[in-house]
Amino acid sequence: MAIWQVDFYFVFNNTSDIPYAVLAEDSFIKLLSVFPIGKSWNNDLIVYGELDSTCICVWKDSNNVEISCRLDVSSIKLQEINAIINFADTNGLMIFCNEQTIFPTLDNIRKIIVDSSAYRFVKNPESFLNEINNNQL
């Protein structure tokens, strides 16, 4: 994951192992309109978007999937956030980030972004790197 990205997982009934059967197939089709299929380094991983930008990663096994999301704080678009929220809402998914399960809303995603080290880096790279150098993180 890049320094300008923040990530989180989607959970269903408080677990990251999501039964594939509960996911609406058309929700993935809708994702494609915003996030085309990107390059993957594993046959069991489907990447919607690009790994070094905003993307949704879907790990598949025989019955379950694990879904994570990376937000490119340096270039995030409202259309992308809305697509992520719609995907979660359509499938009854919650966001798991920083040891908390939260509803997938614009305000909650904004808070995830603003509270992230990625945001601090994008806002002021030199100050952020000085914090790292001075062990202030």
Regions found by a protein language model. Give the residues of each.
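Acidic (Asp/Glu-rich) sequence patches and key acidic residues
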Residues: 1-137
